[in-house]
UniProtKB/Swiss-Prot annotation:
Lineage of the organism: Eukaryota, Amoebozoa, Evosea, Eumycetozoa, Dictyostelia
Organism: Dictyostelium discoideum (Social amoeba)
Protein name per UniProt: Cell division control protein 45 homolog
Entry keyword set: Cell cycle, DNA replication, Nucleus
Family: Belongs to the CDC45 family.
Protein function: Required for initiation of chromosomal DNA replication.
Keyword Nucleus in annotation: yes
Length: 644
């Protein structure tokens, strides 16, 4: 069933708390992304506040859930299984066959749509919804309204058909009149045989006209029925995301009056930022949620009567905001606040610049790189020209940002606002947040997400551990990194993220220069097979970043907007990791249809195939089956496109 009210959640939490008296009764299953980790952090803080024992198990896909079913669920002490971003879109009772009558799976998942079996299950599965299921009901009403409009359009089309039919009848009447005139031709008047033949011919023609008219109407009716059926089918096939699990979990904490526990608000901000960075939600959805969090943050961190805290903390907004090293200073009005605080702030759309240098940050950031087309000499010249017009020497922008002359750092935002539009860089900022630590150091929400994600998808090639052991170790490092006590771990993640982004840009340049991208009718695709490149891209989120970059690169070159299929060979498994991307923020498309096409192609070709995450648009296909899999995918999507 679906749970949507705070009252019911309070009741459910009381049940979880009551069961905890028996021992370690809560098992938390967590997917491998920053949003899931942030949501888990919120949940564990809540559980710890009530002295509820718990066990955390990281899961990367369906196989891990099956392993949980065959091992952990046999523990009779476990009463509650809380699933974060790892159960909403699959039938839980099919996977957790060992659930006993005393166990309940609680799902907090941003993946949409929900499995219908989870919704209808009345005993062992409960979805803690963010409100989007209600919205889906409302959307169903809108859909019904839309169908009414469609019926009205069909009626209009029918009226047009009537007009066409009347025109045809008029034409036929005219022909009949001409024939009648011919019958009364004086030359034919004396021929009785003509009268007989004409009369018989007239009856046959009339029957043919009626038959043709009926066939025509039947064809139109079938065509309209097929179109309507297809539209309904497409609505069910698309996957998309609801609110981040961390945002949902924070909302639930407010229902329990536990929202003031340490760092819960920051974890929620990270969950929202993760969805934005990885383009799982629309810009409009992000902006609306940003406003909500901004209000919460301003209420939690008052500024001594200053109603516009956000303006006071926009980077570069005021020279007095900087110290002698060019770093943002703590505002005097906040000195009475102890510990860390969150600050609403504009963030640049060139990534990690605080921990990098300006030149490489702009060069490797997708937005700037695609606008300037830095894979070409002209694009690189434009980037250098931008700095020249801003009056910042290259030796300044190519050194660590922290070492830059404070004067240039102070003027950066203003100079970009003036000169950026000359190069098509008109949207260089987005609304975000900074976390200011008690020691006066700071990190942005976006940089934190980049770092946590990089830690989770890093490789230890020198280790003798199995892939499973390595990624579980990575998960715990990522989990620990967002704690205030592990700033050093975050710094490692920042370095790894910078290295990954450089490799992504290099790979994009290489693919464009080598013409490695193939246009396959309804989509473009490319596969990475060179050993030196593979270690970076055998991870879902890293490969997704590359695919989004490639998609925007082609759009920037004036190519038609098309979905993108990106794959990387995993030599150890002799298989390809494949990510299907339907759209990005630049295409205004956030839903994804690849999941259903992948499933159909795998079934039809009998390919060795498995899901590599809980996102159905990320799969693993055997190397030997790749060609027939992609070939069928092309045929299926081509047929769908033609039939639209």
């Amino acid at each position: 069933m679906v749970l949507t009210t705070d009252t019911k959640f309070s009741e459910i939490y009381d049940i979880i708390k009551g069961d905890s008296v028996q021992g370690e009764s809560v098992l938390i299953l967590v997917a491998r992304d920053c949003d899931s980790i942030a949501a888990c952090k919120i949940l564990t803080e809540i559980l710890k506040s009530d002295l509820i024992a718990y066990n955390i198990k990281a899961v990367s896909g369906y196989e891990d859930l099956e392993n949980v079913n065959s091992t952990l669920l046999e523990n009779e002490e476990i009463k509650s299984i809380i699933m974060i971003n790892c159960g909403g879109n699959i039938d839980i009772t099919n996977v957790f066959t060992n659930l006993n009558d005393q166990q309940v799976a609680y799902i907090i998942d941003s993946h949409r749509p929900y499995s219908i079996n989870n919704i209808t299950n009345e005993s062992s599965v409960l979805i803690i919804d963010d409100g989007t299921y209600i919205e889906q009901d409302e959307l169903q009403q809108l859909s019904d309204d839309s169908e009414e409009e469609e019926e009205e359009l069909e009626e209009e089309e029918a009226e047009e058909d009537v007009v066409e039919d009347e025109a045809e009848e008029a034409e036929e009447a005219e022909e009949a009149e001409e024939a009648e005139e011919a019958e009364f031709d004086p030359e034919n008047e004396d021929n009785p045989e003509n009268d007989e033949d004409d009369g018989g011919s007239e009856n046959i023609d009339e029957n043919e006209r009626k038959s043709k008219k009926k066939n025509k109407k039947d064809k139109k009716s079938k065509r309209k029925h097929r179109k309507k059926k297809k539209k309904k089918s497409e609505k069910l096939e698309k996957t998309y995301y609801g609110k981040s699990a961390a945002v949902s979990m924070y909302s639930l904490s407010t229902f329990l009056n536990k929202q003031n526990l340490d760092d819960l608000l920051w974890y929620a901000v990270l969950g929202l930022t993760d969805q934005f960075i990885h383009e799982k939600i629309t810009l409009d959805s992000y902006e609306q949620q940003y406003k909500n969090f901004k209000e919460l943050i301003l209420n939690n961190y008052p500024t001594d009567g200053d109603d516009d805290q956000e303006e006071r903390y926009r980077p570069g907004n005021d020279e007095d905001d900087y110290d002698e090293n060019g770093d943002l200073k703590r505002h005097p009005s906040s000195m009475f606040l102890h510990g860390d605080k969150i600050i609403p702030s504009d963030d640049f759309r060139f990534m990690l610049y605080r921990h990098w240098n300006l030149y490489e940050s702009l060069f490797n950031s997708r937005y700037v790189a695609c606008k300037l087309r830095v894979w070409k000499a002209k694009g690189r010249f434009q980037l250098e020209s931008l700095f020249a017009m801003m009056g910042i020497p290259l030796d300044q922008v190519k050194q660590k940002y922290n070492s830059m002359n404070v004067h240039y750092k102070k003027q950066l935002k203003q100079l970009l606002a003036i000169n950026g539009p000359k190069f098509g860089l008109v949207n260089l900022y987005f609304n975000s947040f900074l976390k200011k630590y008690s020691n006066n150091s700071e990190i942005s929400a976006s940089d934190t997400v980049y770092a946590v994600t990089a830690l989770m998808e890093s490789d230890n090639l020198e280790s003798d551990q199995s892939d499973q052991d390595i990624w579980e170790q990575n998960f715990w490092e990522a989990y620990d990194s967002i704690s205030n006590k592990n700033i050093d771990l975050l710094k490692i993640g920042l370095k790894q993220s910078i290295q990954l982004q450089k490799e992504i840009t290099r790979q994009v340049t290489s693919m464009i220069e080598k013409r490695s991208v193939i246009l396959s009718g309804p989509f473009r695709y490319a596969f990475i097979t060179e050993s030196s490149d593979l270690k970076y891209f055998i991870h879902p989120l890293a490969l997704t970043k590359l695919g989004l970059f490639m998609m925007d690169a082609f759009i920037s070159m004036g190519k038609a907007k098309r979905p993108f299929l990106i794959g990387a060979l995993n030599e150890n498994k002799n298989s390809y990791l494949i990510v299907g991307i339907s759209g990005s923020h630049s295409t205004d498309i956030q839903s994804n249809t690849f999941g259903e096409y992948f499933r159909k192609s795998a079934e039809y070709t009998d390919a060795t195939f498995k899901y590599q995450s809980f996102d159905t648009s990320i799969v693993e296909v055997s190397k030997t089956d790749l060609h027939k899999f992609v070939e069928h995918l092309h045929g299926t999507m081509q047929t769908t496109q033609i039939s639209k």
